[in-house]
């Protein structure tokens, strides 16, 4: 029995069915008053499912005022209303449904849907918050074009924002005003956003690769306007990087970021209207550490990169969450590596993965990066889905090489633009672009747990050959007792006389461990080498190898791979601490370690390392 089988309310990936109705256009009229907000939603619907299937709209904590079908008010006998759903039977294949609800954002303490923060009204709709704003098929595979009109008191809410481009501003009665926004790109409900409040803007302009100017605005409380410059520069850097690396140009005329103190997630990638917690936007040398600057840079870039990997191409269902999050974490990690020190960034990511995600994989809640079942999707915004998901994408990048990986990503964005798709669709594009069979690779999406790779090397001096035997162990995890071998890219180098020797690609050869045990042979090795394994941490695995202190010293001071050199230093330092703890005095390893550190300091290694 699977981990969640038999639990009431469990949703299974295998049970996925397309929606019975699609929504081509959503028109929202939102009138904000103190203590009450009225939302009129107009949905243009078309039947996808079987004839006679009723329309089922999700809704929670909504006070329904009325319903119209094609302009005619429905009597209570014409629909069924429950605590979390509105069901309308006997609909024509094409129709327009209009609803009016009242909500109270001031009393919404869940911080999901539409709520009042200290400084503004704002939204959080991922994963299932839109149903707290209006009745809607609140699922990621229903994509629609939105036109939103916000009305509020001008004095208390002078700023009215939503997705897309501002198309109309006008005065209303009794000191109120309206703003109408139109987003021409179809999106799921979880990417909807609206903000109303007394906010100040920090502005800049980015000129895209085609020469189009894009207005950039960061909206904050007045007290925070002097702390947005770094976030703005990070946004511009991310926009340029996405053009240069992926060929992706921003697609609207305006990009807004709103930062509030009491946002319940770090940040949210709503189309063209990101909402952030201030901790991920505000930075200044007087108040921010280096780590704080890096966090702002990484989170701003992550949310921007979602514009394509998550927004233009989105998830069919929430089981595919890693499709957008794993891919985008990989993208923001590569961005930070290019902007700063690649070695330092990789080491930081590995430390986090080993410390936190490996523990999740080893515990009772171990799950694949693409789960098969959930009770509450909010519980699957996990390190496995995000961080291990990014490592799965990185392995594709390693196996295919940068050029073919980018070709696969470009095919993915072209083929599925404006669609809600799956992890399999992503892998299909990588396979098609590279001409490789990636059938076995899909196991990474299905199997939980951290594989262990055991390495043993043998040098044949007479034949001038080095034989490296790799064995993989995939131990049982909850709900998965029998594991199949995974394709594990083990980036490998060899050091002879303290220096890396030429291999397939520079000083690295990618060994593809796809069986329980395999032996790889290196020819033309003139002396016993020291193996440099898992270069760049090429796979999210635990590596077991018997290495002498001499081998570790060689790797620490002579390897040209920053991760392996750092990892060797960690092992040596641990041994030195253990030796000092046992004897109470320095030993041979301590003097050797000092010499290795001196060689690193004067060597060619990245100074940031």
Report the location of each language-model feature.
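Surface-exposed beta-strand/loop patches in extracellular or lumenal glycoproteins
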Residues: 40-62, 135-138, 144-153, 424, ...
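Extended, low-hydrophobicity, Ser/Thr/Pro/Gly-biased non-transmembrane segments
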Residues: 100-203, 227-230, 441, 561-566
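N-terminal, polar/Ser/Thr-rich
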Residues: 1-38, 115-124, 131, 136, ...
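Short, hydrophobic/aromatic-enriched beta-strand segments in well-ordered soluble domains
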Residues: 40-45, 59, 91-108, 146-154, ...
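A surface-exposed beta-strand-loop module
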Residues: 31, 48-50, 54-55, 59-117, ...
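Beta-strand-rich binding/interaction modules
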Residues: 63-70, 192, 437-440, 450-533
């Amino acid at each position: 029995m699977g981990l969640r089988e038999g639990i009431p309310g469990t949703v299974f990936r295998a049970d996925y069915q397309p929606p019975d109705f699609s929504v081509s256009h959503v028109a929202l009229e939102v009138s904000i008053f103190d203590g009450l907000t009225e939302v009129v939603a107009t949905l243009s619907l078309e039947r996808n499912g079987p004839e006679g299937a009723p329309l089922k709209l999700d809704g929670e904590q909504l006070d329904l005022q009325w319903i119209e079908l094609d302009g005619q008010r429905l009597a209570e006998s014409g629909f069924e209303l429950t605590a979390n759903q509105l069901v309308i039977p006997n609909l024509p294949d094409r129709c327009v449904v209009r609803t009016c609800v009242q909500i109270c954002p001031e009393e919404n303490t869940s911080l999901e849907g539409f709520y009042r923060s200290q400084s503004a009204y704002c939204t959080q709709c991922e994963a299932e918050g839109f149903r707290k704003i209006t009745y809607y098929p609140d699922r990621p595979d229903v994509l629609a074009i939105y036109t939103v009109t916000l009305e509020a008191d001008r004095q208390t809410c002078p700023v009215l924002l939503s997705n897309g481009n501002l198309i109309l501003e006008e005065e209303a009665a009794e000191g109120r005003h309206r703003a109408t926004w139109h987003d021409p790109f179809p999106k799921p409900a979880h990417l909807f956003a609206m903000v109303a409040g007394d906010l100040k803007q920090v502005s800049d302009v980015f000129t895209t690769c085609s020469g189009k100017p894009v207005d950039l605005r960061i909206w904050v409380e007045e007290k925070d306007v002097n702390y947005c410059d770094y976030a703005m520069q990070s946004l511009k850097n991310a926009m340029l990087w996405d053009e240069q690396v992926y060929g992706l140009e921003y697609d609207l005329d305006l990009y807004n970021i709103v930062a509030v103190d009491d946002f319940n997630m770090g940040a949210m990638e709503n189309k063209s209207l990101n909402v952030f917690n201030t901790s991920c936007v505000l930075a200044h040398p007087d108040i921010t550490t280096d780590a704080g600057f890096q966090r702002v840079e990484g989170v701003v870039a992550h949310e921007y990169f979602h514009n394509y990997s998550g927004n233009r191409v989105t998830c069919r269902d929430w089981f595919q969450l890693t499709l957008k999050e794993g891919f985008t974490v990989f993208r923001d990690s590569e961005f930070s590596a290019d902007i700063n020190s690649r070695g330092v960034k990789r080491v930081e990511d590995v430390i986090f993965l080993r410390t936190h995600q490996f523990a999740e994989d080893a515990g009772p809640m171990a799950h694949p990066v693409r789960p098969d079942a959930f009770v509450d999707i909010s519980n699957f915004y996990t390190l496995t889905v995000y961080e291990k998901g990014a490592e799965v994408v990185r392995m594709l990048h390693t196996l295919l090489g940068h050029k073919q990986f980018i070709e696969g990503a470009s095919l993915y964005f072209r083929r599925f633009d404006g669609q809600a798709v799956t992890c399999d669709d992503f892998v299909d594009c990588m396979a098609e672009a590279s001409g490789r069979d990636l059938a076995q690779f899909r196991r990474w999406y299905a199997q939980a747990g951290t594989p262990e790779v055991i390495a043993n090397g043998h040098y044949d001096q007479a034949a001038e050959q080095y034989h490296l035997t790799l064995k993989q162990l995939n131990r049982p995890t909850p709900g998965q007792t029998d594991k199949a071998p995974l394709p594990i890219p083990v980036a490998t180098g060899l050091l002879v006389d303290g220096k890396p020797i030429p291999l397939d690609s520079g000083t690295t050869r990618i060994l593809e461990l796809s069986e329980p045990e395999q032996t790889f042979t290196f020819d033309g090795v003139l002396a016993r080498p020291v193996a440099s394994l898992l270069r760049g941490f090429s796979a999210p695995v635990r590596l077991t190898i018997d290495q002498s202190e001499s081998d570790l010293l060689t790797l620490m001071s002579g390897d040209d791979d920053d991760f392996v050199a750092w990892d060797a230093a960690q092992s040596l330092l641990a041994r030195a601490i253990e030796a000092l703890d046992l004897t109470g005095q320095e030993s041979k390893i301590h003097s050797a370690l000092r010499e290795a550190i001196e060689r690193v300091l004067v060597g060619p290694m990245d100074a940031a390392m």
